[in-house]
């Protein structure tokens, strides 16, 4: 894949839905790059639109320009980010992922690069009732979901138990169904955006253990709710 080839030569392409252990999905569109490919006549021609580097295979003769070298790619990524943030809540200080969130980090990088720093969205942000309790230990904040589907793909492809599903289409649809299988739900809390809260860390519980991920120390361990007993690094 283009995104893996870029990693090997030290070129960073932002992404949210991509994960090396999961099959490509190109959901978030944040890794768009400017691509030119050789045709049958050997002439290299640019593709009409930016392409997701997480779902495109690297081939001989390709010419790839990332956000660092292409204004087209940079504009496409900035536009994607603007759409992601239109309805995203500004609650980073109380979010479990505050301080180590890829969405937050990339937004700050774009602002530092001179991209659009103030929203042009003047309507009311979309909201959902919260929290939605998926299991006794996992709470879902649907306002924070960016529809990357990493949780859905993890369940389907890693333990092979599709215990969670995303229903509907479009920005107003995030509806999750746990399908009554919480055995592997412990893996959800490791997701990159703070839409899943561990109940002990949730600020509404009144627990003395209230904190955020960035304040935790990582130690080797085994997730209590993992039926696989796979090693992990809980905080």
Label each residue range with its predicted role.
Residues 2-35:
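A basic, amphipathic helix-loop patch mediating RNA/tRNA/ribosome contacts
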């Amino acid at each position: 894949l283009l995104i893996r080839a870029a990693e090997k030569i030290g070129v960073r392409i932002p992404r949210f839905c991509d994960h090396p252990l999961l099959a490509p999905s190109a959901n978030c569109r944040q890794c768009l790059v400017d691509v030119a490919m050789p045709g049958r006549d050997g002439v290299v021609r640019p593709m009409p639109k930016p392409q997701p580097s997480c779902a495109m295979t690297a081939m001989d003769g390709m010419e790839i320009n990332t956000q660092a070298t292409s204004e087209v790619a940079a504009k496409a990524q900035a536009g994607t980010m603007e759409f992601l943030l239109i309805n995203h809540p500004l609650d980073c200080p109380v979010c479990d992922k505050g301080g180590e969130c890829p969405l937050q980090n990339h937004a700050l990088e774009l602002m530092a690069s001179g991209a659009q720093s103030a929203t042009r969205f003047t309507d009311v942000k979309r909201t959902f009732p919260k929290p939605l309790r998926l299991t006794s230990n996992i709470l879902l904040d649907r306002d924070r979901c960016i529809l990357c589907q990493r949780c859905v793909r993890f369940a389907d492809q890693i333990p092979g138990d599709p215990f969670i599903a995303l229903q509907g289409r479009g920005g107003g649809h995030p509806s999750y169904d746990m399908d009554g299988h919480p055995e592997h739900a412990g893996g959800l809390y490791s997701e990159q955006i703070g839409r899943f809260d561990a109940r002990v860390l949730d600020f509404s519980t009144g627990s003395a253990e209230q904190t955020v991920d960035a304040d935790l120390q990582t130690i080797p361990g085994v997730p209590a709710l993992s039926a696989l007993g796979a090693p992990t690094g809980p905080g």
